[in-house]
Amino acid sequence: MIKEILKKADEKMGKTIVALKRELASMKAGRANPAMLDRIEAEYYGSMTPLNQLGNISVPEARVLLIQPWDKSALSAIEKAILKSDLGLNPSNDGTVIRLVIPELTEETRKNIVKTVKKTGEEAKVAIRSIRRDCNDDVKNLKKDDVSEDDIKKAEDDIQKKTDKYIKEIDSIISAKEKEILSI
């Protein structure tokens, strides 16, 4: 029973790290990255469809994203979706492809992005601590099942070690992203 709780903690904490990495990948860092467009959806034949399912997204130059839709009729919908997004990019539609030029980041913009990165990191840490609390509650409930105090204490220590490991990983991911943003 304790092993299952520890496994559940590991899985949930791992998913939190994956979600954090995905979230950070979509943040602008002054260079083109197709992941920036992952959360943008365009209306296509009546339903909202992610841009990466509407066409090919490539990076021909360091600060240029090129979107080649498989269906040319989707060009205007893709353009509207990009304009509505919070990325602040101006799409250039030439009738066959959409070009997105990623502007140079100002110092102020960089600092704002770093603040957002730190906030996102803190949210991930809160999620990890919440998972720790839930797992510790599950372990404490095992007292009813005649599990020894020593086993419960050891399980709580193991959960704390996992928590510390994942929080340390979050810190390193956040500091790497900050360096990436500030060094460009």
UniProtKB/Swiss-Prot annotation:
- What does the record give under GO molecular function? ribosomal large subunit binding
Does this entry carry the keyword Signal? no
One GO cellular component, as annotated? cytoplasm
Q: Which UniProt keywords apply?
A: Cytoplasm, Protein biosynthesis
Q: Which InterPro entries match?
A: Ribosome_recyc_fac, Ribosome_recyc_fac_dom, RRF_sf
Subcellular localization is given as: Cytoplasm
Among SUPFAM superfamilies, the record links this protein to: Ribosome recycling factor, RRF
Q: Which GO terms describe its biological process?
A: translational termination
Which NCBIfam families does this chain map to?
frr
What does the similarity note say? Belongs to the RRF family.
Q: What does this protein do?
A: Responsible for the release of ribosomes from messenger RNA at the termination of protein biosynthesis. May increase the efficiency of translation by recycling ribosomes from one round of translation to another.
Q: Which HAMAP family match?
A: RRF
State what protein this is by name.
Ribosome-recycling factor
Q: Which organism is it from?
A: Clostridium botulinum (strain Okra / Type B1)
